[in-house]
């Protein structure tokens, strides 16, 4: 059995076992927020799952372009690209607005901005998403190890968050429209 970590294939030696345990434990300990430097990409890429180029969610964000630009948030090929420091700005902004207009679950969306992070994009294929997110690839799906079970537990929680993202889009669209009316 071999494992791919950071795009490099290793036999499952002691180093690889340790690396898997460490990364799984780190994700667990920080409540699934990827704050550790060795897995943190430069940008946070939040995919608008299932969205068309002219969907209301993207259109609302584009209308808010100047506001986003001031916080170093940009669009790239249909994805919302948020530099890591900008993600905290967005999270704080959402918390602030949540207090003003009393929209439930906006806090969850702020968490999503921190949660879904990796180098390219959030693929609409869940399996591919997990492979990108954790940078692990297990060729033999029948091999049950303690490390693999840890990863699968994290995947189940991640899957639940991803399923909720589309519902949260509607709330964020409403929130942006609300702020636009205040300007």
Curated annotation (Swiss-Prot):
Keywords: Late protein. Induction: Expressed in the late phase of the viral replicative cycle. It comes from the Viruses. Belongs to the asfivirus S183L family. This is Uncharacterized protein S183L. It comes from African swine fever virus (isolate Pig/Kenya/KEN-50/1950) (ASFV).
